[in-house]
Design a protein with these regions (language model features):
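Active-site-adjacent structural elements that line small-molecule/cofactor binding pockets in enzymes
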Residues: 1-290
Length: 290
């Protein structure tokens, strides 16, 4: 069995947003042995969501900054809302990040859920799924053609520099809808968010009937507390809460249903994040047999 992939949600948003805290967390994650660090995406949070997303650093700019400060850590967005952006500009940004990071970009993409944000940006919410489907097709074609003159439906153009990572930045698909599973079968990696193992299992099995070699790496919130319980994250979704051995047991349940790793949110906006990531690395990861 390959080693579990261990990613960490980095604090690029929240009341405690601070550049040194963001960089320090990424460097600590790299030193502690995490495989990847992930920022979160929102561009313009409407007032009703400002309590969580009102203070957020743009994710792709953040990845470029973090790429210059780290050396080994893979860097990604969980998850990049492609339909809110110019699709070819996104390709240019991701391939440039691949170049700047020396091939360390791996990112999840999603159709998005915040309708008012789409309205603020003048983006098409109703057809966002169709937009993402088309972008995935274009991205796959572009990565195959690079370097050189690329042919798009709208014409021809150069998308340089050449790719560092063979095949281009690794694309995961985030979400929990049936459409998400169809997209994940194309890219090969599914990134569900806030699903308990028992709800994830049938969807995982369906995905692997479509593509047996698919990897599944969920985003899971895990909070250190004295007493074990079913917790909730900042948006009221499923989370794991308890002492280290309980968290390890709950995460092992994901492995038991077929997951290939996790991207963990260790309460990104609370004080002491670096202490928690070290505690996770030293007291939880060894129990997972990784």
């Amino acid at each position: 069995m390959p080693p579990l992939h261990l990613g960490l949600i980095l604090p690029n948003y929240g009341e405690r947003l601070d550049v040194e805290r963001l960089v320090g967390t990424a460097l600590a994650a790299e030193e502690a042995g995490f495989d990847s660090g992930w920022v979160t995406d929102h561009l313009l949070a409407p007032p009703e969501h400002a309590g969580i997303y009102g203070s957020i650093a743009e994710p792709l700019v953040s990845l470029g900054f973090l790429a210059a400060r780290t050396t080994r850590l893979q860097l990604g967005v969980s998850a990049l809302v492609v339909p809110q952006r110019n699709p070819l500009v996104v390709l240019k940004q991701l391939t440039t990040l691949d170049f700047l990071s020396k091939g360390r970009i791996v990112t999840a993409v999603a159709a998005g859920w915040m309708e008012n944000e789409f309205a603020l940006l003048g983006a098409d919410f109703e057809h966002r799924g169709r937009t993402l489907n088309e972008w995935l097709r274009v991205a796959a074609s572009a990565f195959e053609q690079m370097p050189g003159l690329l042919r798009f439906d709208s014409g021809e153009g150069w998308l340089a520099p050449a790719l560092v990572r063979p095949g281009g930045p690794e694309l995961w698909v985030a979400g929990i809808s049936p459409q998400t599973l169809r997209r994940a079968a194309l890219t090969g990696v599914w990134h569900p968010v806030a699903l308990p193992p028992d709800e994830l299992r049938p969807m995982l099995e369906e995905l692997r009937t479509r593509r047996p070699d698919s990897r599944v790496i969920p985003r899971v919130s895990a909070y250190f507390q004295d007493e074990p319980r079913r917790g909730v994250d900042e948006r009221g979704r499923y989370a794991v809460a308890g002492p280290p051995e309980w968290i390890a047991e709950r995460l092992a349940a994901y492995v038991d249903v077929g997951c290939d790793g996790f991207v963990v949110n260790l309460d990104y906006d609370a004080p002491g994040l670096e202490d928690r990531l070290w505690r996770f690395a030293e007291q939880v990861v060894p129990s997972l047999g990784n």
